[in-house]
Amino acid sequence: MDVARSEFFETGTPVACTSCQARHGVVCGALSKGQLRELNRHSLRRKIEAGCEIIAQGSESSFYSNIMRGVMKLCKVMPDGRQQIVGLQFAPDFVGRPFVRESTLSAEAATDSEICVFPRNLLDRMISETPELQRSLHDQALKELDAAREWMLTLGRRTAEEKVASLLHLIATHAEPQTATSTAFDLPLSRAEIADFLGLTIETVSRQMTRLRKIGVIRIENFRHIIVPDMDELERMISA
């Protein structure tokens, strides 16, 4: 018996799930081993190139997904065609809105990404049968609501410097690998997208990035690679 099959029989967990970040996430972490095996049988891993849309606003999606790797940006398109980035999602976030067929947002890969896709009808059934999964999704919805309120504060009351620092902190806290005090990551958004997300001009974003570099809060390599030598210092900038 090979190691993979042995691991399955010993743990009852599908091999593909054992090293997956989402195994203990909002959805999979609330499932029984039997449910996890059933979900795994119907799931498909997909690699998504940056810029590819996985859910279109107004469309009826037949699937949900967990982010395995990469960053997704959530966008809202106005009737006149103007677009606003309204959120970012990272591994191992759950993408989708249970029991609502028509998507109110679009989801697009901001970076090269990998997702685990599974049928909407299957998970909807599991939700209706599993109180623990219902609670998990409810708790996640409340966390997202709290995060949205915090972001409203950022956009409405924080300075341009604090806005840029807040976005960098958001990305940094989801970056891997990271130590207790420092981290490094590639920006998943262009300067124009950052400006759109924060309600600033591109020039203001560039000036604030330069200022953060000059005072030593960040280091910038190859334009998009960011090093945060002291996470505590970055956090102090947005907690003042």
From Swiss-Prot:
Keyword Plastid appears in the UniProt entry: no
Domain HTH crp-type residue range list: 158-232
Keyword annotations of the record: Activator, DNA-binding, Nitrogen fixation, Transcription, Transcription regulation
Region (Essential for the oxygen-regulated activity): 17-28
SUPFAM superfamilies reported for this sequence: cAMP-binding domain-like (SSF51206), Winged helix' DNA-binding domain (SSF46785)
A Pfam family the protein falls into: HTH_Crp_2
Binding region for DNA: 191-210
GO biological process: nitrogen fixation
Function: Promotes the microaerobic and symbiotic induction of fixN, possibly by binding to the FNR consensus binding site upstream of fixN.
Protein's UniProt name: Probable transcriptional activator
Originating species: Rhizobium leguminosarum bv. viciae
